[in-house]
Amino acid sequence: MDAQYTPHAIESAAQTFWDKNQCFKAVEDATREKFYCLSMFPYPSGKLHMGHVRNYTIGDVVSRFQRMQGKNVLQPMGWDAFGMPAENAAIKNRVPPGAWTYDNIDAMRRQLKALGFAYDWNREFATCDVDYYRWEQWFFTKLVEKGLVYKKMSTVNWDPVDQTVLANEQVIEGRGWRSGALVERKEIPLWFLKITDYADELLADLDKVDWPEQVKTMQRNWIGKSTGVELSFAVADSSEQLEVYTTRPDTLYGVTYVAVAAGHPLARQAAQDNPALGDFLEECQQGGNSEAELATMEKKGMDTGHKAIHPLTGREVPIFVANFVLMEYGTGAVMAVPAHDQRDWEFATKYGIPIEPVIADAEGNTPDLSQGAHTEHGKLINSGEFDGLEFDAAFDAIAARLEANGQGTVKTNFRLRDWGVARQRYWGAPIPVKYGPEGQTVPLTDDELPVALPMEVEVDASGSPLKKMPAFYDLGEGWTRETDTFDTFMESSWYYARFASADNMEAMLDERADYWLPVDLYIGGIEHAILHLLYARFFHKLMRDFGLVASDEPFQRLLTQGMVIAETFYRANDDGSKDWFNPADVDVQRDDKGRPVSAILREDGQPVEMGGIEKMSKSKNNGVDPQAMIDRFGADTVRLFMMFAAPPEQSLEWSDSGVEGAHRFLKRLWKLVADHLDAGTPAALDADALNDDQKTLRRKTHETIAKASDDIGRRTTFNTAIAAVMELVNAIGRFEDTSPQGLAVTREALEACVLVLAPIVPHACHALWDALGHDTPVIDAAWPQADEAAMVKDSVELAVQVNGKLRARLDVPAAADKAAIEAQALEAENVRRHTEGKTIRKVIVVPGKLVNIVAN
């Protein structure tokens, strides 16, 4: 073999071998245990970032490890290709989104292949391929027929300049993220999927999956199952009733006002005779309508002049319009208890509304409400016949009274809302519905599918071009086609299943889906904990109920990898803005502990400020180009650093010196193998003929195999597995025995290193395995098995303490009994010196660890 480690030649040769031999093509085999490993597929931006590299390296290491366990492994890759960024790029660069997207896919595929990931590229697809989304359209028509889809008026974020609907995350401080215009709330008809029909099952089945508890908790909170009371407040001088839902009926006697949404019929009716209220309702239509935005916005309201009648006391309380109440959530009306709800307290304080406590504090006294609401449970006060009851008893008693009066009922509610799947955008899958001349709404038939998105279009900022293309929407005889497209979460909600049968042009899925699903390990960022992962679970249950899949859940195990973070450097400008400089352009002075002390921009030699360690991002200019690292060090070095620098769930701090260290390690391993091959031919290993040094190295080899097997297979702590191999490499480097048995032990140790590292640095290990004389490639090798006999020690070292202080170390036979160990410990010279003239009171032997002698 070449004595020099030349990563690019080595990696090119390995990748050529894998491609030529279709090494990663997955074929269903009912006689073998399968393992489906999937990393969340990327948006094709055109350039991989280090977050991608980390995610996909973790998946690749697990996939290759499971293959070495003898499993039939599927690891596919595709592209989450629809969405806003392509439209924005099209507007900016004046190119069709489709052309931009497919060019980016080609560029990113090259980058992924350069990293040597073991993907079955035969199954690749992009979600903008008509052969993919045609089945989504087909399935949607089936959901319409089953009554799981409906269309209703819904409030959206409307950008009056761009003339388009914005997602909540595209509204920044009440303004459109691109136009900067004040966003309006506007009602338009939208399509919804009935995810709420599955709320109970989505909640219960979280117990079936091996996911991080944090993610399960986030989903439970998002689904938000609660038990409360739905009750009615009559409107004074009217036949109207206001329906409200509360989880705190125990606070009912503390209601001092009712708040309704600006879109509530009562608010609109009141505004007809009140121009000021009309202006306020219009103001409420400005700004975003996300819960996050509502939580931070200034709370505003206006009295409607109407009164609500308290259902138990008969007292009249004012009805306000409040900007924090939305028609989309619940009934569009809330009962307000300012003494015991902080938001209600702030509103009441602002508008001079009475605040009346009805729950005692922990001491049983009237709570102090001068600084805020008292939100804890406690005994009821000022609540008539219900005084003195604790929460549970009060809940039941007040609910029973309301039910008896016909004014309320106990109800289970969910925070979860049905999924709005329509977007007024161009770059998405067209919704397969048509509208008739007499107002008919009809799903398209199978022979009208697919509805292909026109690809050669000019996109500008004035909204979807589909609305301006009669060739697309005009079906003749008064029939028109829907011009909305699907939310891109639709495509990512079932892609994992399509990988099982991606080549089937006749069906959405086939029996191969039942072989591969569920996904055994799904890997991605925790930022997808709610929407994507919840929608995918819902979609899976829909597919199950249509007989398309057999399992209840899509992803059996979930691994949420941490961020890749790096140092940041900037200079502040006079206007308060900052210019950020890439770490590659900055020289950093560090103290003796490696901490940064000062930094200078190389270009001008002037100092820059250190902004601390942050997630790699364009905005902070602290990203590292993976391709530049591959070009400089090779893919294996990048992969090794990614796996060694931190456990997968934790943030990984980028370190140039760490990358250089990973590269040095690979060069060292390469040289050890080359030197070993130059040293001669080893004998067949004879475990019974080994001397102590040979046994020691062999023991280290098998301890390393045992540790790495557990670290990778069970704990997924790849960094500790790599650390164990590094220790073994150090031991091999110190072992200079070139006798036939010495070479045999060295050969076994080196082969163990290569096998354990093969999932992590596959290119180098492909070459090293071949150099070590194997006919079959390392990709087809089995994971090494630890030899229990080799790990048995002939002797063990024990610490000997006298009265708790270390006085000696003993080498004793591993099989020695307590009496023999005790005798040997008492004979040790330094022990005798410290026990001379004293009475031995007790000798405690902790097998394998220490001897403690008590003497006085």
Swiss-Prot record:
Q: Name one GO molecular function term.
A: aminoacyl-tRNA deacylase activity
Motif 'KMSKS' region extends across 615-619
Please identify the protein, giving its name as recorded: Leucine--tRNA ligase
Where is the protein localized?
Cytoplasm
Question: Top enzyme class of this protein?
Answer: ligase
- Write the Enzyme Commission number(s) for this entry: 6.1.1.4
Which annotated residues bind ATP? K618
Coiled-coil zones? none
| Family statement | Belongs to the class-I aminoacyl-tRNA synthetase family.
The record, for PANTHER family, names:
LEUCINE--TRNA LIGASE, MITOCHONDRIAL, LEUCYL-TRNA SYNTHETASE
Organism (species)? Chromohalobacter salexigens (strain ATCC BAA-138 / DSM 3043 / CIP 106854 / NCIMB 13768 / 1H11)
Say yes or no: keyword Aminoacyl-tRNA synthetase present.
yes
Q: Could you tell me the gene encoding this protein? A: leuS
Q: Write out the entry's keywords from A to Z.
A: Aminoacyl-tRNA synthetase, ATP-binding, Cytoplasm, Ligase, Nucleotide-binding, Protein biosynthesis
